[in-house]
């Protein structure tokens, strides 16, 4: 991105920021909580950009003064050296800030700010795959807790020997999708299962889908397309187990998508959860189809989000996690403990690099 384009975009962002501040002072906006929250969120997103732009302008002014001082210092060796040092420092600060602002202005995925439904399904490997799905769930729960996101299991099918055949987690917080979107795909594990008596390494898989939450306005459901039935929730015993039909089995007839919810205490709550999951699945399907139509774009991304894409291998013997999109290895144990910062940060950096490359290609075209 050349300096002129960068400056123009920063001026536009600053104008938007000032407009949002005026709107926040409007009594009509203050009386509408949903609109107020939306405007406040966008203002918070733009504020660091505006402050950095002001700092960039200050640096440019000081840099011009340093250049003039250097010009005026010809013949005075001591003053000339001071001016050169000052100019070098200002140029370094300017370059660093320019790079940061360029990255901040890269095209944003409008879904990045959203909370998500995280679906984990056991793949190849039988009982070991179910155990692996459970390990992945714990990994994401630990990471989410570390960064301050709220995690709740909203649908699960437990396996006989532990773990899950299928699990859906609701992960809510700031910019959840912007980080967890890189987790979509096939996660492969290579280890000796607890049930293996001869010490042989087995390979198992689990598939992760990351679905941004969708609201009722965004994905409208026709009641005629829904087949909703209830069932008795299973449990470990107790007075109410298998006596009250609180579980909800939801079928979306046009797509065949089925959602079964048992985690909430009441039938109404399970019904609402099932509808949330269905909306997220339908939105994911719609956006995946749109991305497929723009296949050249999709293939260039760090991860296409395709459920069938093998993104990572976890090798217990070598204590190594390999991210195949990055071609990089990470230490296994911290990753499984939810220390995903370096791994996700590397994915974000690669995505930014690819976006910068695409902008450069467009500029040259």
From Swiss-Prot:
Positions where N5-methylglutamine occurs in the chain: 239
Record Pfam families: PCRF (PF03462), RF-1 (PF00472)
UniProt xrefs under Gene3D superfamilies: 3.30.160.20, 3.30.70.1660, 6.10.140.1950
Gene Ontology CC terms, in alphabetical order: cytoplasm
Homology family: Belongs to the prokaryotic/mitochondrial release factor family.
Compartments where found: Cytoplasm
Protein name: Peptide chain release factor 1
PROSITE patterns noted in UniProt: RF_PROK_I
Keyword tags: Cytoplasm, Methylation, Protein biosynthesis
Entry GO MF terms: translation release factor activity, codon specific
Keyword rRNA-binding: no
SUPFAM superfamilies tied to this protein: Release factor (SSF75620)
Native species: Synechococcus sp. (strain CC9605)
Modifications the protein undergoes after translation, according to the UniProt entry: Methylated by PrmC. Methylation increases the termination efficiency of RF1.
Function field: Peptide chain release factor 1 directs the termination of translation in response to the peptide chain termination codons UAG and UAA.
Stretches the record annotates as Disordered: 289-316
Cystine residue pairs: none
InterPro entries: PCRF, Pep_chain_release_fac_I, Pep_chain_release_fac_I_sf, Prokaryotic/Mito_RF, RF-1
């Amino acid at each position: 991105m050349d300096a002129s384009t960068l400056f123009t975009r920063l001026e536009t962002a600053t104008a938007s920021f000032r407009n949002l501040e005026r709107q926040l002072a409007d009594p009509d906006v203050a009386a509408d909580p949903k609109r107020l929250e939306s405007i406040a969120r966008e203002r918070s997103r733009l504020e660091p950009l505006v402050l950095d732009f002001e700092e960039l302008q200050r640096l440019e002014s000081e840099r011009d003064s340093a250049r003039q001082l250097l010009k005026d210092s010809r013949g005075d060796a001591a003053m000339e050296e001071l001016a050169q040092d000052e100019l070098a420092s200002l140029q370094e600060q300017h370059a660093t800030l320019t790079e940061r602002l360029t990255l901040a202005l890269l095209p944003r995925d409008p879904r990045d700010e959203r909370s998500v439904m995280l679906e984990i399904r056991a793949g190849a490997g039988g009982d070991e795959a179910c155990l692996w799905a459970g390990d992945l769930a714990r990994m994401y729960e630990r990471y989410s807790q570390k960064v301050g996101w709220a995690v709740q299991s909203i649908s699960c099918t437990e396996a006989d020997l532990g773990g899950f055949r299928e699990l859906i987690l609701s992960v809510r917080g700031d910019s959840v999708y912007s980080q967890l979107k890189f987790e979509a795909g096939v996660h492969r594990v290579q280890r000796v299962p607890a049930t293996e008596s001869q010490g042989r390494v087995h390979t198992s898989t689990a598939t992760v889908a990351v679905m941004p939450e969708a609201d009722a306005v965004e994905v409208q459901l026709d009641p005629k397309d829904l087949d909703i039935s209830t069932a008795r929730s299973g449990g470990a015993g107790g007075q109410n187990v298998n006596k009250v039909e609180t579980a909800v089995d939801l079928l979306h007839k046009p797509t065949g998508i089925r959602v079964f919810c048992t985690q909430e205490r009441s039938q109404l709550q399970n019904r609402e959860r099932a509808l949330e999951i269905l909306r997220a699945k339908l939105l994911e399907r719609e956006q995946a189809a749109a991305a497929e139509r723009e296949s050249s774009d999709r293939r260039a991304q760090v991860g296409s989000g395709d459920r069938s894409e093998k993104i990572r291998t976890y090798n217990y013997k070598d204590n190594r996690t390999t991210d195949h999109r990055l071609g990089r290895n990470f230490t296994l144990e911290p990753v499984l403990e939810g220390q995903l910062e370096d791994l996700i940060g590397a994915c974000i950096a690669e995505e930014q690099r690819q976006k910068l490359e695409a902008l450069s290609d467009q500029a040259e075209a």
